[in-house]
Amino acid sequence: MGARWNGWTAGALALALAWPLSSRAQIAETSIQPVPEANWSATAGRTVGAGSSMLQAEAGWPGISFTYLKGLDERSDVGFHIGLNYGFEGTTNRVTGINLAIPYRRNLVSGDTDIAFQMQPGISIYDNDGVLFGIGGPVGVVAGFHLSPPLTLDVGVDIPVLLSFSNPAGFMFGPQFGGGAEYLIDRNLAVTARVRVGPQFGFTSAGSSSQTGFVTLIGLAYNAR
């Protein structure tokens, strides 16, 4: 009888010790959530998604900007952009101005590598010892490489174009090359960074010129889907 009682006691004790261990293992197993798939992007090759709306704020050079994008379908989005600049069109010239544009992006290739065409036509107004008014915007292509579900690296080329009607009147353009990155914090929030650099050419009523233009921006994007 004593041996049987000791056996029951040992079994009950083993069960009591094993239960919290299995419970903790189950809790640990169920509490680890998989990283969400990066099925949208703010500045790389993917769009924001059909019916989704994205808000993005960026700061750096040549200024501070706010962008709204709406997914028209799985491959294209369009929106509105406002830039408050303290640098002239990505050059080292310190001129204050504002840029209002309508960004458009079209995904051309999708998969582990995404390629998109993008443009941002609009108007620019600068205080350049008088009012400089112009129309134009960057046109370019970007390719995004998905290294992991939350991380995307990209390379791209943009050609900023500005047709100025006053102070001075003329035409400015130049190819800019560079790269960037996006990191998805959760399924709706991403941190972005991008850099572009290249020659900038100007043919205006004040004469012709060339200099180095660059863009360096860090941002935060939220997809309200």
Which stretches of residues belong to each language-model region?
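Bacterial N-terminal signal peptides that target proteins for export
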Residues: 2-11
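Positively charged, low-complexity intrinsically disordered regions
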Residues: 5, 25, 195-197
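Outer-membrane beta-barrel transmembrane domain signature
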Residues: 41, 108-115, 119-225
